[in-house]
Amino acid sequence: MLTMAQWTLIAVLAQLALAGYELWRIHMGLESKRWPQTTGKIGKAWQEDDFVRDIGDEEGTHSVYARYRYRVDARWYDGRRLSYGVTSRVRFNEALDLLHQLRAGGEVDVYYDPGKPQRAVLYPGSSAGNVVLLATWIVGATLTMALR
C-alpha cells in the first residue's frame, strides 16, 4: 500500500512530465517557424465535437484533425499533425478557422523538419494554449507539494 507521501510524489512527477511535454511542444512550435515549406495535398480534414461542455457554453469544444501527403526530395510522406499549438478542445470559431483552408483534395503549405522530414505541420508555431497548459501543470505540481 502506498503512503500519502508516495502518492504525492507520483502526482507531482506526473504533472512535471506533462509540463515537460508541453515545453517540448512549445519548443517544436518555435522550431517549426524556421522549417522549409513544400506543397501538400489534403486527404481528409474534419472536426469532432468534444463531449465536455463548459458550463454556460452551448457550443462546447471541438477538436480538428487532418490527413495530408507531401513530398520532400522525391519521397512522399503522410502527415497528421496540424500544429504544435493547441488544436483540440478549442472553441467552435477556432475550429472553423483551422478548417477553413483544409478542403479534401486541396493544396496546402506543409512545413517540415529538414533533419526529420516525416515530422511536419500545416500551421507552424505554438499557441497561447500551450503556455496556459504549461503553467497549469507547474502550478499544479507546486500546489500538490505545498499542500501535502
Task: Please annotate each region the language model reported.
Residues L2-L147:
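Oxidizing extracytosolic/periplasmic lumen-facing domains
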